[in-house]
Every structure is written in C-alpha cells, then in structure tokens.
C-alpha cells in the first residue's frame, strides 16, 4: 500500500545533493550564541545552521524553537547535538561558549575558566571541520582568540576574534547620537583590546571625509570643552551598564558576529576592527591578538590595514598589548 508521500510525489533525481558550502556552526546556545544564531538566520547567510552545547535540554529546546520558525526563514536545515559530528564541514564556526561575565567582573578575570573550556571545544571543532574559519566571540576575546589559534593549529588568517567590531559600533552609535547623524555616516575606529584598555582613534574620526579633530583640535583630550572623551568612556562602560540592567549582553554582540560572518560568507572584503595577531605592528613585540582594521573575505582574514596613528594612540595600543600579555603569559594551555 503506497504511503501518502508516495501518492503525492514521484521521485525523479537519483543524485544525492552535495552538502552546503556555507554551513555555520554556533558553539554555545546561551544568550550570545542564540542572538548570533537568529541574526545569522535573519540575514540568510547559511543553508545549514548547527548548534552545539553541553546542556542537552536547553540545546534541544532552542533548536526546536528555531525550527518552528522555519516557514519564516530561508535556511532549510537547523540541526543540534552535543556531539560535534553535527558540526562537520562547517565553513564558519562561531564560538560563544564559556563562563559568563558576572556583574562588575572584568573580561580578563574570566580567562582561565574559559581556557579550560576551550581545551575541549577547539580540538572537537577542528576534528570535524579542519578547513573552517573560527570566529571567537567568548570573553576575554583577544586572549581566547590566541588560545584558539594555539589549540587549533590553524593558520592565523582562519582564526578571528570578534574584537572591537562591537566597540566601534557602540562608538559610532554614540557619535551619531551626539551629532544627530546615522551611525553608518559616522566614521570612527576603536582598536586594541575588546575591553577596558581599548583605544579610540580620535585622529581618524570623520563625517563625510571631514575630520572632526580639524574642527576641534582638543577632541578626545581632557582640554576638550565638549567632552568627546566621555563617548569612549561610555563605550567601555556600556557592557557593564547593560549587564547591571539586564544581567548579560546579547543582541548587539550577536548582530556583530553575524556582520562578521556576512563579510566572510559573502566574500565582501569589508574592513572590520577584529582581533588578529599584531606582533610586529605598531610597536607591539609580544605574541598577542588585538583588534586592528582587517579585511574579511572567503578565506578569512586576508589583509591588515596599516592605520596612521598618533604617538599617544600608538602608546595606548602598546599598553593594551602589555595588559593582555601580562595575563596571557601565565596561562596553562
């Protein structure tokens, strides 16, 4: 007796379709992981999304919840398992797993807790997706990107930290608020550590090619009557503020991760401030990962843009590197 499906459909093709070339895995289905997942889905970036976590019930529930929205998405396959075989042949793997930053806790304080988690995660990712591009989002992101690079054995162009992509977005949002202009037309870069020692490049801040330091030479200094310095302070404080108010950050960092995935998967060659190995640049001598403007495309991080920094900006960047190295050198990998 023929089934309903057999009565409805005549199968024509004998060929098994090839797997997707744009598969994305998100490791960790916490607030950040799910914000990244939904942002990636809503941008139509992937034909297959895989989710992995150690918490099986939470993982199953999140996957079901997304699958129930399949009608509203263009991603035909959403899979989830605690077994990493589900991640096989991913093009991009977004790592958001790790211990969560507590109220008042610095990102650097999180570090050894998350290093131990990475020792399990990274080898499993590489086992099933040896050709993937790793996008590290877990904090402290710069140190954990270094850790992922060391543990994975991947070339540096395929290990990227989300870095100050979000800090720069926050900066441009606040700059836009101050000027009454959309953030996409407010150009400013925050580089260095994703965290307390990040460096705002005031010398490059511009709108429509008009450099604001040309209009206000004191911009970013203590002498500035308009107190633009407070814009960067708000960038640094914003995560702490959001954590204090709602307990965690999720939406903006999720959108930031999807933004980076888009540049990679669509081969856009867009320039982003992301965390990469900066040894030998801007006077940094240690093997640290920090954010500088990088071009992202199909093979990962293809180029680094050499910023023209003022001496005080370069000094701050070196100080940022020293802060990270101080923590990094004592890690047990």
Swiss-Prot record:
UniProt: substrate binding residues: 107, 139, 170, 249
Molecular function terms, GO-annotated: L-lactate dehydrogenase activity
Catalytic residues as annotated in Swiss-Prot or TrEMBL: 194
Reactions that this protein is recorded to catalyse: (S)-lactate + NAD(+) = pyruvate + NADH + H(+)
Biological processes annotated in GO: lactate metabolic process
Keyword Magnesium appears in the UniProt entry: no
Localisation: Cytoplasm
Tagged with keyword NAD: yes
Pathway noted in the entry: Fermentation; pyruvate fermentation to lactate; (S)-lactate from pyruvate: step 1/1
GO cellular component: cytoplasm
Residues binding NAD(+): 30-58, 100, 139
Any Pfam family: Ldh_1_N
Disulfide bonds: none
Keywords: Cytoplasm, NAD, Oxidoreductase
Catalytic activity, EC: 1.1.1.27
SUPFAM superfamilies reported in the protein's UniProt record: LDH C-terminal domain-like (SSF56327), NAD(P)-binding Rossmann-fold domains (SSF51735)
Subunit structure, as described in the record: Homotetramer.
Family the entry assigns: Belongs to the LDH/MDH superfamily. LDH family.
PANTHER family for the chain: L-2-HYDROXYCARBOXYLATE DEHYDROGENASE (NAD(P)(+)) (PTHR43128), L-LACTATE DEHYDROGENASE A CHAIN (PTHR43128:SF10)
Name under which the protein is recorded: L-lactate dehydrogenase A chain
Lineage: Eukaryota, Metazoa, Chordata, Craniata, Vertebrata
């Amino acid at each position: 007796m023929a089934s309903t499906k057999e009565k409805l459909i005549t199968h024509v093709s004998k060929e098994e379709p090839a797997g997707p070339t744009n598969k994305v895995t998100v490791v960790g289905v916490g607030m950040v992981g799910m914000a990244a997942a939904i942002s990636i889905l809503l941008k139509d970036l992937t034909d297959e999304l895989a989710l992995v976590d150690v918490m099986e019930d939470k993982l199953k529930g999140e996957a079901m919840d997304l699958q129930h929205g399949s009608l509203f998405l263009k991603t035909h396959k959403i899979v989830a398992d605690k077994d990493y075989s589900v991640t096989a042949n991913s093009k991009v793997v977004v790592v958001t797993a790790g211990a969560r930053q507590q109220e008042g806790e610095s990102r650097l304080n999180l570090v050894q807790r998350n290093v131990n988690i990475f020792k399990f995660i990274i080898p499993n990712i590489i086992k099933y997706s040896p050709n993937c591009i790793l996008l590290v989002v877990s904090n402290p992101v710069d140190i954990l990107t270094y850790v992922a690079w060391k543990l994975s054995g991947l070339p540096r162009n395929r290990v990227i930290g989300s870095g100050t992509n979000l800090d720069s977005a926050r900066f441009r949002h606040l700059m836009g608020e101050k000027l009454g202009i959309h953030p996409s037309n407010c150009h400013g870069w925050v580089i260095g550590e994703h965290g307390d020692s990040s460096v705002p490049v005031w010398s490059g801040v511009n709108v429509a090619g008009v450099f604001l330091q040309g209009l206000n030479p004191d911009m970013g200094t203590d002498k500035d009557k308009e107190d633009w310095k407070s814009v960067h302070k708000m960038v640094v404080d914003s995560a702490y503020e959001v954590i204090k108010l709602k307990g965690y950050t999720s939406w903006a960092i999720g959108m930031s991760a999807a933004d980076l995935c888009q540049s990679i998967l669509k081969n856009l060659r867009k320039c982003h401030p992301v965390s990469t190995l900066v040894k030998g640049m801007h006077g940094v001598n240690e093997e640290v990962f920090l954010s500088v403007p990088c071009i992202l495309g199909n093979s990962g991080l293809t180029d680094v843009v050499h910023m023209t920094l003022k001496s005080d900006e370069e000094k701050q960047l070196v100080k940022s590197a020293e802060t990270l190295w101080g923590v990094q050198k004592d890690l047990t990998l």
